[in-house]
Regions:
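Helix-rich, typically C-terminal accessory recognition domains appended to large enzymatic cores
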Residues: 19, 36-37, 69-216
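Alpha-helical recognition segments enriched in aromatics with Gly/Pro capping
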Residues: 1-91
Length: 216
């Protein structure tokens, strides 16, 4: 047996089953039955979504947020974006309906950008640099679980698109590809509407490092 590549769980796991699992692996290692002293290569603890009152959600406190209700009102993609945007992955964060609505406005803006599609692009060198920087940033952030900063980068790109009079289908498709891991439903639907094959079957965009810095 080899080590588990990635173990993800809350801090409550540390003094419960994880403690005993590690004990057994140490024992098996000592008697020569497994090749590694530890059972995990990487251990990550995720934060907890707290209630709006900054306390742990509890029915007795009346501060529980039902995700089914959120999905019905705002959609699964908005909930997914908000949960990733709340803060550092490993830190607790209180629920904020105002911030959730902000994520809904972000998704609405992405949808409205489709109305700007035109063969005459408002392309500039600074936009090309921003696109390449965004791809590079998202690759790094996704790998290092920086989901909140990943979404911030996408918001900057969306705002840049929104300031243009028009954007090409290729530029819009790039945005949809980058947003797809976070909001798969709306991006696949928009992608189909502009005539492309499924994003989930496409190659991830490749950035040009030489174009991540604007010429002066």
């Amino acid at each position: 047996w080899n080590r588990v590549d990635w173990y993800n769980g809350g801090m409550e796991h540390t003094a419960r089953h994880l403690l005993y699992a590690r004990f057994w692996v140490q024992f098996l290692y000592n008697i020569g039955l497994v090749p590694n002293k530890e059972m995990i290569w990487t251990r990550v603890s995720h934060g907890m979504v707290l209630g709006p009152d900054n306390q742990k959600m509890s029915k007795s406190k009346g501060n529980v947020i039902n995700p089914d209700d959120i999905v019905k009102e705002y959609g699964a993609d908005v909930l997914r974006i908000y949960e990733m945007f709340m803060g550092d992955y490993q830190m607790d964060a209180p629920w904020s309906t105002d911030s959730l609505r902000g994520c809904k406005r972000f998704v609405d803006k992405v949808v409205r950008l489709k109305d700007k599609l035109n063969e005459k692009s408002g392309f500039t060198e600074s936009l090309e640099v921003l696109q390449n920087k965004t791809i590079m940033k998202i690759e790094y952030d996704m790998t290092h679980m920086g989901y909140n900063t990943c979404i911030s980068s996408l918001m900057i790109l969306v705002n840049a698109y929104d300031e243009l009079d028009s954007i090409t289908k290729e530029d819009y498709r790039l945005l949809l590809q980058l947003l797809n891991p976070i909001a798969p439903h709306v991006t696949e639907e928009l992608n189909e509407m502009i005539g492309y094959s499924p994003i989930c079957e496409s190659e991830w965009p490749v950035y040009d490092e030489a174009k991540t810095v604007e010429n002066t």
